[in-house]
Amino acid sequence: MKASELTAKSVEELNAELLGLLREQFNLRMQHATGQLTQTHQLKIVRRNIARVKTIITSKAGA
């Protein structure tokens, strides 16, 4: 997910994207805790995508 793709979206779309990412992060954390997650780098990727979305939401709210 690129920041340029996110800036084109509205705040409502970004909030929906954020909700989906948070759910994905929760599922990955549960899989990691139970030992089912083999691709642990996905946790890092999702965490950074959440940060990207939150940053864009904050910048749009300030504008």
Swiss-Prot record:
Keywords: Ribonucleoprotein, Ribosomal protein. PROSITE patterns: RIBOSOMAL_L29. Signal peptide: none annotated. SUPFAM superfamilies: Ribosomal protein L29 (L29p). InterPro entries: Ribosomal_protein_uL29 (IPR050063), Ribosomal_uL29 (IPR001854), Ribosomal_uL29_CS (IPR018254), Ribosomal_uL29_sf (IPR036049). It comes from the Bacteria. Pfam families: Ribosomal_L29. PANTHER family: 60S RIBOSOMAL PROTEIN L35/50S RIBOSOMAL PROTEIN L29 (PTHR10916), LARGE RIBOSOMAL SUBUNIT PROTEIN UL29C (PTHR10916:SF0). Belongs to the universal ribosomal protein uL29 family. This is Large ribosomal subunit protein uL29. It comes from Shewanella pealeana (strain ATCC 700345 / ANG-SQ1). The gene is rpmC.
